[in-house]
Structures are given as C-alpha cells and as structure tokens.
C-alpha cells in the first residue's frame, strides 16, 4: 500500500501504533515496526536514562522506522529533547504543549516531526512551521481536552491541510 504516510515514514502500511503510557515500550514498538507499520515509544512520566535505553533496545529488535512521543508539558522535556536528538529515532510525535519551537531542532537532526493536533488552528500553525505530518485527535482520545470528535476535526482539517494526516 502506498500513501503519503507510508512514503514519508518508509513503512509498508499506513498505521501508527499510538503512544500509550506504560504500554508502548520497545518490545511492542519493534513488533509493530517489524510487521510493516510503525510504533511509538511513550515517554510520559519517564526519565532520560529510561528514554535512551528504550530507544536503544528498540533499535536492537528492529531496523525499521519507529518513533517516540514527547509530552511537551513534561518537566524534563528539554533533557528528553536532547536524548531524542542524540539517539535519532525516525520520527517524534509531540503533544500536550506548543510543538512549533521543537520542529526545526528535530528536523535539523534528521528526525521527522509529527505533532498531535486537537484543532484546525493548531493544524495550520504546525503546517506553516514545517511539520512533516500530523496526528488529529479528538475528545474521545485518552488525555485530550478538546471539545470536538476526531471525525468532526477531520472534516474541518483535511480540506485545509496539505501534509499527511
């Protein structure tokens, strides 16, 4: 199957396994990547050493692309940004904060940036800032405070956006 997302991430199927705290660790992520989709290591509540070890452990289990999810409200986000840039997963998903200042530093390190967006306004901002793709999440997604469902967000966002969703 060939889509904008499969081409961007060099994966076989246009499926991104979500970052679920305490569940999305290296074994799951590598298994998803090895099956032709891509996985995301959830960093919520984790420290820098754990983050580095998880990325390295995942690389030992797969040579396929995978990503990490960084919650921008994390008190140690700057340290985690440095670790992610050093370890170079294929992509990073960004949520729970303003992703715009982080897009260029990650891209300069060769890491694709895929922010999670809960609104058309943020979707336009991250596209204008150069994000590689975006994940649209509505109010039914865990931990999100938006007031629209994913379906209604998609109806508003897709006609306005040219990057992969």
Model-found features: residue ranges?
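Active-site entrance/lid segments in N-terminal catalytic domains of soluble metabolic enzymes
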Residues: 1-164
């Amino acid at each position: 199957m060939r889509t904008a997302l499969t081409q961007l991430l060099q994966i076989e199927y246009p499926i991104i396994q979500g970052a679920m705290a305490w569940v999305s660790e290296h074994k799951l992520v590598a298994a998803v990547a090895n099956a032709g989709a891509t996985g995301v290591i959830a960093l919520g509540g984790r420290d820098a050493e754990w983050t580095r070890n998880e990325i390295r452990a995942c690389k030992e289990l797969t040579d396929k692309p995978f990503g990490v999810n960084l919650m921008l409200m994390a008190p140690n986000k700057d340290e985690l940004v440095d670790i992610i840039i050093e370890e170079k997963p294929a992509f990073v998903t960004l949520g729970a904060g303003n992703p715009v200042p982080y897009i260029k530093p990650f891209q300069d390190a060769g890491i694709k940036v895929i922010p999670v967006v809960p609104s058309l306004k943020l979707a336009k901002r991250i596209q204008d800032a150069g994000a590689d793709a975006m994940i649209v999440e509505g109010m039914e997604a865990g931990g999100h405070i938006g007031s629209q469902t994913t379906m209604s967000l998609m109806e508003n966002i897709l006609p306005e956006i040219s990057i992969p969703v």
